[in-house]
Design a protein with these regions (language model features):
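AMP-binding/adenylate-forming domain of the ANL superfamily
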Residues: 2-4, 49-50, 79, 93-98, ...
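Acyl-thioester-dependent condensation/acyltransferase catalytic cores
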Residues: 1-37, 44, 102, 106-109, ...
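Active-site-proximal acidic secondary-structure segment that organizes catalysis
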Residues: 24-78, 163, 302-322
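Extended, hydrophobic beta-loop-alpha segments that form or line the acyl/peptidyl-thioester binding
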Residues: 50-56, 152, 171-178, 205-212, ...
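Short amphipathic alpha-helices and their capping loops
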Residues: 1, 5, 17-19, 54, ...
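His-Asp-centered acyl/peptidyl-transfer active-site segments
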Residues: 31-32, 85-97, 143-156, 166-269, ...
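Flexible, non-catalytic linker and terminal segments flanking ANL/adenylate-forming cores
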Residues: 222-224, 253-262, 300-357
């Protein structure tokens, strides 16, 4: 019942003329409570809500102990405005703008004709979480060590290859990569909206090996994270009408936040992952535990159960780890009937037609 009530609150629009943050307290047992908080995405991001949660726990603990409430360490709205205007007038902003102007993806990605939403899906409600096989997590660690890349680069590579298989294009793939714009110390105490999304554009010619693709992806991620503060959406909305609505997003979310309320331990977790333009895959956990959740209404992925997508990604990861020297063209990422569907969407038959003089 608590989840249903929280979901109802979550699906009730917050008017921009009213409060953009809301809280509710549910008592489920004599000694068990749930605190539910949500904020309009223009006002606070996930890290901002974590700051608020820690502050609530601090105030509660002080009241229970009969102690003075510690002063807040939050920055103010003025601090946020000054931080953003200062960045906009800086050389860093100009460098970041130049970089992203040269690294926007072309008007490609998933086929434009497949942007329609799957019936019964919305862009916010996440799926259930499915745990990846610990043996597969071991393969991720192994490949990460052998190639000297970060672990999340392996998961991102598998996601990119799956998205590429459905795109009808064999030479390039573009993903949305959510990032935090909190790159300076002052921004890390602001309970505000400082999240962003940057495009991750990857060359994936068929002859490239798995290892080369993974290393290139890791290098590309390191490069773009040097420019993660820039609001890339301001360029994508105004340069050539580029749209991101048909790109798959891949996001990595930290494990649950542990809080203490007057000696009582509490665990905080996200009930959704924010707005999703097309479709998103969310990897959660730490160590040997890795969970996958999805959200979004974009096809074809919204028609798959999360367990199916997890199984597909696991097969890709196992194949990648087994032979990093194999070419990308040797990876069979689709089922037999799915190849025919992609051929139809991408108009592959046109390649066999005689050229028009």
């Amino acid at each position: 019942a608590v989840r249903e009530m929280a979901s109802a609150i979550q699906h009730t629009p917050l008017p921009l003329t009213g409060r953009l943050v809301k809280f509710a307290l549910f008592r489920t047992q004599d000694d068990q409570y749930y605190i539910f908080g949500l904020g309009h995405h223009i006002s606070v991001d996930g890290l901002g809500m974590a700051l608020v949660s820690r502050r609530i726990a601090t105030i509660y603990s002080a009241l229970v102990a009969g102690e003075e409430i510690p002063p807040a360490y939050f920055g103010s709205l003025r601090d946020l405005v000054e931080l953003e205007t200062g960045y906009a007038a800086s050389g860093d902003f100009q460098d970041d703008q130049t970089y992203w102007s040269q690294h926007l993806p072309p008007e490609s990605g998933l086929d434009q004709r497949r942007r329609e939403a799957a019936a019964g899906h919305d862009a916010y409600t996440p799926s259930a979480s499915v745990q990846l096989d610990p043996a597969v997590v071991g393969h991720i660690k192994e490949l990460s060590k052998n190639l000297r890349i970060r672990r999340y680069s392996v998961s991102t590579a598998a996601t990119a290859l799956l998205a590429r298989a459905w795109s009808g294009s064999s030479s390039e793939v573009a993903l949305d990569f959510p990032v935090s714009r909190r790159v300076v110390a002052e921004s890390k105490t602001l309970p505000a909206m400082l999240a962003g999304v940057v495009p991750l554009v990857l060359d994936a010619p068929p002859e490239l090996t798995v290892g080369e693709f993974c290393r290139n992806l890791d290098a590309r991620l390191r490069e773009l994270l040097q420019h993660q503060r820039f609001p890339v959406h301001t360029l994508e909305g105004g340069v050539g009408g580029r749209q991101a609505s048909n790109r798959v997003a891949v996001n990595f979310i930290p494990s649950r936040l542990t809080l203490e309320f007057g000696g009582a331990q509490a665990t905080a977790s996200y009930t959704n992952h924010g707005p999703v333009g097309h479709f998103g895959l969310f990897f959660m956990g730490a160590g040997d535990e890795l969970l996958l959740s999805t959200a979004g209404a974009g096809e074809p992925f919204a028609s798959f159960e999360v367990a199916d997508l997890a199984e597909r990604l696991q097969r890709i990861i196992v194949a990648m780890a087994a032979d990093p020297d194999r070419p990308l063209s040797s990876l069979d990422l689709l089922l037999e009937d799915e190849h025919a569907r992609v051929d139809g969407w991408s108009n592959r038959a046109a390649l066999n037609e005689p050229a028009v003089a």
